[in-house]
Swiss-Prot record:
Keywords assigned by UniProt, alphabetized: Cytoplasm, Elongation factor, Hydroxylation, Protein biosynthesis
Pathway involvement of the protein, from the record: Protein biosynthesis; polypeptide chain elongation
PTM section of the record: May be beta-lysylated on the epsilon-amino group of Lys-34 by the combined action of EpmA and EpmB, and then hydroxylated on the C5 position of the same residue by EpmC (if this protein is present). Lysylation is critical for the stimulatory effect of EF-P on peptide-bond formation. The lysylation moiety may extend toward the peptidyltransferase center and stabilize the terminal 3-CCA end of the tRNA. Hydroxylation of the C5 position on Lys-34 may allow additional potential stabilizing hydrogen-bond interactions with the P-tRNA.
InterPro entries: Elong-fact-P_C, NA-bd_OB-fold, Rib_uL2_dom2, Transl_elong_fac_P/YeiP, Transl_elong_KOW-like, Transl_elong_P/YeiP_cen, Transl_elong_P/YeiP_CS, Transl_elongation_fac_P
Key word Cytoplasm present: yes
Short name of any one Pfam family annotated for the protein: EFP
Modified residues (N6-(3,6-diaminohexanoyl)-5-hydroxylysine): K34
NCBIfam families listed in its UniProt record: efp, PRK00529.1
High-level lineage: Bacteria, Pseudomonadati, Pseudomonadota, Gammaproteobacteria, Candidatus Pseudothioglobaceae
Annotated GO MF terms: translation elongation factor activity
Locations listed in the record: Cytoplasm
GO cellular component, one term: cytoplasm
Name assigned to this protein: Elongation factor P
Record GO biological process: peptide biosynthetic process
């Protein structure tokens, strides 16, 4: 596998750190008033999902992670596993609940998701940036409700709970930003 110098670090680069594949979230070059410059790098461990911050001096190298990202279409959940398919080769992937647990509320049938494979095993799933979900349960809207800073909690048809404006009612379809779990507008 390739080795990467800290000069080559950029957001999204996949590297091996402590025997686990990690993705760089942020790379900051720090030049103290006295002493040698160093890089403060924020990583996301692709296996555990934890965020790590490490510092590296110039001249250090890290091994690249042998991970593969595939665009797969979400098909269905059979109760125990989530089924995905490659839309080009029609190869199917069955992914366990542990891998899917953090994003299962954003999985909508037929949507294309990015599935990261390491040693031919799925280790993470990235849903589309925005999904359309239906409001399953929320407090009823009152006459005169308008868009404002306040909101109310709403449960979506997939089980996700998020803050929505006061005018949203049960049965409405809303656009949700999956990166920050926020209401993004009406569908």
């Amino acid at each position: 596998m390739d080795k990467y110098s800290i000069n080559q670090f950029k957001n999204g680069l996949k590297l091996m750190l402590d025997s686990n594949p990690c993705s760089i979230l942020n790379n900051e070059i720090v030049k103290p008033g006295k002493g040698q410059a160093f890089n403060r790098v924020k990583f996301k461990d692709l296996i555990t999902g934890k965020t790590l911050i490490k510092t590296f001096k110039s001249g250090e190298f890290l091994e690249g992670a042998d991970v593969m990202e595939l665009d797969l279409q979400y098909l269905y959940n059979d109760g125990n596993a989530w089924n995905f398919m490659d839309p080009h080769s029609f190869e199917q992937y069955i992914i366990d609940g542990i891998t899917v647990s953090s994003v299962k509320g954003y999985l909508v049938e037929q949507d294309i998701c990015i599935v990261t494979l390491w040693n031919d095993n799925p280790i993470s799933i990235t849903p589309p940036n925005h999904v359309i979900l239906e409001v399953f349960d929320t407090d009823p809207g009152l006459k005169g409700d308008t868009i404002g800073a306040s909101g109310k909690p709403a449960t979506m048809n997939t089980g996700v709970v998020l803050q929505v404006p006061l005018f949203v009612s049960i049965g409405d379809k809303v656009k949700v930003d999956t990166r920050i779990n926020e209401y993004a507008g009406r569908a």
